[in-house]
């Protein structure tokens, strides 16, 4: 599925009804038209850019000062950077849709900029998985966390996730190119699988669906099921705001990426002559724009989570975000849980 144009498979211009181009009138004058989905995508892109750049830049600014000493700040700093990179590419994608998919920015920009949305998808879900593992260890392995949970280890984990995300984005870099539209003067930027094996498009679609959606969904569901059971069974951990924030972020990720993943699989598996394919293809820009909403919702979640009953209007946005993303009660509870565990084991050894 292509973040730029509605053509996400092999480039071909043969139409079943024998006409050179179904959108071209009989007099040969091609008048490009904008689909309703494209108009909706433009509105969403504009809103996401305004909110996403401002919000994520604020999160980066707040967490950058905390990242030297707190693990939570490192997690959310990297999430904000991934979202901010995607949001900064939006003006170019916006321009491409306004120009009816014409790409005036050159070959290198075609390779890099649209691929940022995939880099954001993979880096976000891998970072969310890492954050979830951190939450899991804090609850179930508090002694280990007291010894080894340090900012240095968190930075190493983030580095690994970024490398993996880049590796998973390689197919977009390899198969994306620009070409001239034979029916107009437009230059198009899209995915071309014609030079790869016949199965490459389906293989990439399956990889993207499994690694970027299904497997993380199953893993995070299992992880948070155990976390919620343990969290609500202990009074000391019932007010863990970071756990709730992470769960909200994870939920938004899967909700906004679901249309993109579903339509991507449909476009990869159905023949281009299928009426279903053509209908889904018209929704391409809209589904990509919905995925982009995920890039701006995290700062909103942080602010909403930090709106306490007292002093809502007196507190500034940076202080709200700093409070939400700080090392919360869960970290303190792990310390108390560690002490209680050690005390219990000491009592058992004395009894023996």
Curated annotation (Swiss-Prot):
One of its GO terms (biological process) is positive regulation of cytosolic calcium ion concentration. Gene3D superfamilies: Rhodopsin 7-helix transmembrane proteins. Glycans are attached at residue 6. The chain crosses the membrane at residues 39-65, 71-94, 112-133, 155-175, 203-228, 245-267, 285-305. It comes from the Eukaryota. Receptor for the chemotactic and inflammatory peptide anaphylatoxin C5a. The ligand interacts with at least two sites on the receptor: a high-affinity site on the extracellular N-terminus, and a second site in the transmembrane region which activates downstream signaling events. Receptor activation stimulates chemotaxis, granule enzyme release, intracellular calcium release and superoxide anion production. Belongs to the G-protein coupled receptor 1 family. This is C5a anaphylatoxin chemotactic receptor 1. It comes from Rattus norvegicus. The lineage of its organism: Eukaryota, Metazoa, Chordata, Craniata, Vertebrata.
């Amino acid at each position: 599925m292509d973040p730029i144009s509605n053509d996400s498979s092999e480039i071909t211009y043969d139409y079943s009804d024998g006409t050179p181009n179904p959108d071209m009138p009989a007099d040969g004058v091609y008048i490009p038209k904008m689909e309703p989905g494209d108009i909706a995508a433009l509105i969403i892109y504009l809103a996401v850019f305004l909110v996403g750049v401002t919000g994520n830049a604020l999160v980066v600014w707040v967490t950058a000062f905390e990242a030297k000493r707190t693990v939570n700040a490192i997690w959310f700093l990297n999430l904000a950077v991934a979202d901010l990179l995607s949001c900064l590419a939006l003006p170019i994608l916006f321009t491409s849709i306004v120009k009816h998919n014409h790409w005036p920015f050159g070959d290198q920009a075609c390779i890099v900029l649209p691929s940022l949305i995939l880099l954001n998808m993979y880096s976000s879900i891998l970072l969310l998985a890492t954050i979830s593992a951190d939450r899991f260890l804090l609850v179930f392995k508090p002694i280990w966390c007291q010894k080894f949970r340090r900012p240095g280890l968190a930075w190493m984990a983030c580095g690994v996730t970024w490398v993996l995300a880049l590796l998973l984005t390689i197919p977009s870099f390899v198969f994306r190119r620009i070409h001239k539209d034979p029916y107009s003067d437009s230059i198009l930027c899209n995915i071309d699988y014609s030079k790869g094996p016949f199965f490459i498009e389906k293989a990439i679609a399956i990889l993207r669906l499994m690694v970027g959606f299904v497997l993380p969904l199953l893993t995070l569901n299992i992880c948070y099921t155990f976390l919620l059971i343990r969290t609500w069974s202990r009074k000391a951990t019932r007010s863990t705001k970071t756990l709730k924030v992470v769960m909200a972020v994870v939920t938004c990720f899967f909700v906004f990426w679901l249309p993109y993943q579903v339509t991507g699989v449909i476009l990869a598996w159905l023949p281009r002559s299928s009426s279903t394919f053509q209908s889904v293809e018209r929704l391409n820009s809209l589904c990509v724009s919905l995925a982009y909403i995920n890039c701006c919702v995290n700062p909103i979640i942080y602010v909403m989570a930090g709106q306490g009953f007292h002093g809502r209007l007196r507190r500034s946005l940076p202080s709200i975000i700093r409070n939400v993303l700080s090392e919360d009660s869960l970290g303190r509870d792990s310390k108390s849980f560690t002490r209680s565990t050690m005390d219990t084991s000491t009592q058992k050894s004395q009894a023996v």
